[in-house]
Amino acid sequence: MRLYLLALNPTDSVTEGFLPAADRLGLAVTVLTDQPDAHRTAYRHLAAPPEVLPCEVRDFREVVGLVSRHHAPDAVFSNSDHLQTQTALAAEYFGLPAKDWRAALRAKNKAQLRRHLAAVGLDTVRAVELAPGQPVSGIDPPFPCVVKPREGVASEDVALVADAAELAAHCAAVRQRRPQDALVVEEFLAGELHTLETLGDGTRRHVLGGFRTRISPPPHFVEEALEFVPEHPRPVVDQVLAQLDALGVGLGACHTEFVVQPDGRARIIEVNYRAIGDQCDLMLARLLDIPFFEHVLRVHLGEPLPAELGARTGRHGHNRAVLADRAGTLTAAPAAQEYEKDGVQLVYRPFRTVGEHHVHHRTNRDYLGVVWAVGDDRRAVDGAVEAFLAANRWEITP
């Protein structure tokens, strides 16, 4: 059986998660990407590197054409935020299990997500969509408000602005970097930030738990740490699931970010119709002790999920980012490592290599690496992460 996997840049989710899972399932994998050299380099260490073909994956017509000229597909899949709609359309073209492309579009397009949830009467967030070049002076948002690229990721160019002057300045700065991108200006949804991780086969849906997310101080929204939450309060989960149902989310993994307000109301921040990233999906699989990546691939092959996943309970997980606090060249950092000590499994993965120079983004793009740990004792898990951070050093030279 052949799996076509669509990707932009290489990610740990694919390299460490989905490709090994595909190998365990006996699948032949063809990676379609617009960055073939980067993927071939990323997969050199794998026992069975996949076939990598260059393709304009942002255009579903190019995907359909290439697959039609190559081997017959059994599944078309992507874990990229940017490629869910294209993947859904290509899979549907070949009559394969597919996400509803409308749901994929609603999740990716933050303005459309707001409009749809308001139209079905589930949640109304005051939001304005700004087309490229559209004057900011003509809108009247509630301050403070959040400005974000309509189809952005990784908190990039997202900021909280306090007044009209800050709004104009931030929009102008973003448009210098990405002049062709539409923006969304929306009311600030205050509350503690959480995630809900779900897995569905189109009929049955499992809630895998979620995370409590610590973010950086305003005006930016950088995810600094995530702690596993086995079960959110049932009324909160029901509200989030109702909104996912209204959006049409059903097949595969979904990572939803939301806040809970003092009155218990759950307000969605964004829906990422794929597995959670930045090593959290790998941590989740280890934490729950389930073949998470295999389950995701199986549903895209048309197989139903089991009634019970057999997830391990009573464990704690802690994911912590190591962030650059300035621009410069990374001149010292620990290597990738993994070990178990005193009942705690700890993993560290670098996101930058020593010698790389980067600007300071003030987003998740500033991650130098991620350390995570899982175990039965929360204090031991948290302590292992703190001990690792204290024992290692990351140096940036301007």
Role assignments for model-derived ranges:
Residues V67-P73, I139-P141, R177-P179:
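Glycine-rich phosphate-binding loop signature in dinucleotide/nucleotide-binding domains
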Residues V136, L297-P398:
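Peripheral (often C-terminal) accessory segments that flank ATP-dependent C-N-forming ligase machineries
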Residues A159, E187, A285, L368-G375:
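Short, well-ordered beta-strand elements within core beta-sheets of diverse protein domains
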Residues V158-A266:
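Internal nucleotide-binding/catalytic subdomain
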Residues M1-A103, A324, R352-V359, T363-D366, ...:
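ATP-binding N-terminal substructure of ATP-dependent carboxylate-amine bond-forming enzymes
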Residues E92-D157, A162-A164:
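A conserved helix-loop-beta module that forms one wall/lid of the active-site cleft
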Residues L5, R234-H255, P262, N272-T331:
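Active-site "cap" helix and flanking loop/linker of ATP-utilizing ligase/carboxylase catalytic domains
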